[in-house]
Amino acid sequence: MKLINEFLEYLKVIKHYSEKTIISYEFDICELYNYFKSKKIDIINITRKDTEAYLEFLYSLNIDKNTISRKLSSIRSFYNYLVKEEKVSYNYFNLISNPKHKISLPNYLKDEDLDKMFEVPDLTTPLGQRNRLILELLYATGIRVSELVNIKINTINQYNRTIKVLGKGEKERIVVYGHMCENIMNMYIKDGRCQLLKNKNNDYLLLNKNGNNLSTRMIRNILDDIMIKSGIRKHVHHHMLRHTFATDMLNNGADIISVKELLGHENVNTTSIYTHVTNEQIKKVYESCHPRAKE
């Protein structure tokens, strides 16, 4: 267990992974540790055959293929660390392939659904202004909820309409917002936020009714409430506005590298999942480009 604790500390101090990510790694690696302990095998002495047996064990749990892939990714990282620290000579998990799985396209909102959601907040109230700004920022910038809650007043450049956000791995990036978001931002900062602040000293942009900054859970609850009041039948996950941002940007001509940077993805392959297009667009492209499609 000492090696596991050292690895988790490495993820925290050197890699700057979030607490949630580290907990996920810990669960996956401890599961591995307990499996081999039950077989009386030391985790630093496993063989290729042992790794194959462990893969069979994961399949026996009847969990989905994405979860198995995630667990294998955690374990590979752990053994790569052990190789680097010269605790083991070879990472046999690098020889294990992830299970093949069907790639599911991210769900996104259509324009009419967005309009319904944006109409819910009452802009005559401080909380309504704040809630509308939450929607505007998530859709206008594509940031994660975890990044949204950490926005401070001094990270916003209202002149250039940019925000400095802290993403995964403590990496900073600049995101841009448009004029519609700007109007709500100005309204909230000048009016709603001042009322919520109640003479408190708080640098965070988004506040609750007591003048304290919001948590990610609070944001999700706000989005759930807006979704119910909007009458949208589909369940709106908090990531769906991020998916919609990426989809709309690409569908309207943005290049994938720019969208990758705005989303804070390390690898363009992660962004490429958003390059799907709607059936309506396929039809429009066909009708406008194919000579036999025109009347």
Place the predicted regions along the sequence by residue.
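Conserved catalytic core of the tyrosine transesterase superfamily
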Residues: 1-295
